Amino acid sequence: MISLIAALAVDRVIGMENAMPWNLPADLAWFKRNTLNKPVVMGRHTWESIGRPLPGRKNIVISSKPGTDDRVQWVKSVDEAIAACGDEPEIMVIGGGRVYEQFLPKAQKLYLTHIDAEVEGDTHFPDYEPDDWESVFSEFHDADAQNSHSYCFEILERR
């Protein structure tokens, strides 16, 4: 199964200048909980923004340019990334925008954090047809001392 996991603000903004324009430790914990012990697939820009392999996960980076860091597996295409995951029950696609766009048609599940924030962004989550997805989990949280904005965790499964 292919799943996408993303945090998105109003207008589907997911990033600005290779970073997330908000501070939500709760979302980082949600991300870790849902990706741990699963292969994670990302584009080169996402890899560069993280700067290190995510522990407890097989890290696969899609890039047209050969990678030099042997702590991750470098592939050139979506199909190579899927093949690199072998028979893993769930592949977690973690970004960025172009990689989400390439995997969305193949995805069976979306793990989304909807952030109640209007922020400038240069990277967006792809537009998806809501009627194609069923919400199977939703959990709202108000902003607090640690989390800069209100947010809602949601899991969608393809109908």
Swiss-Prot record:
It catalyses: (6S)-5,6,7,8-tetrahydrofolate + NADP(+) = 7,8-dihydrofolate + NADPH + H(+). GO terms for molecular function: dihydrofolate reductase activity; NADP binding. The keyword NADP applies. Keywords: NADP, One-carbon metabolism, Oxidoreductase. It is an enzyme of class 1 (oxidoreductase). GO terms for cellular component: cytosol. InterPro entries: DHFR, DHFR-like_dom_sf, DHFR_CS, DHFR_dom. It comes from the Bacteria. SUPFAM superfamilies: Dihydrofolate reductase-like (SSF53597). NADP(+) binds at residues 7, 13-19, 45-46, 63-64, 76, 95-102. Substrate binds at residues 5, 27, 52, 57, 113. PROSITE patterns: DHFR_1, DHFR_2. Its EC number is 1.5.1.3. Residues 1-158 form the DHFR domain. Pathway: Cofactor biosynthesis; tetrahydrofolate biosynthesis; 5,6,7,8-tetrahydrofolate from 7,8-dihydrofolate: step 1/1. One of its GO terms (biological process) is dihydrofolate metabolic process. NCBIfam families: PRK10769.1. Belongs to the dihydrofolate reductase family. Key enzyme in folate metabolism. Catalyzes an essential reaction for de novo glycine and purine synthesis, and for DNA precursor synthesis. This is Dihydrofolate reductase. It comes from Citrobacter freundii.
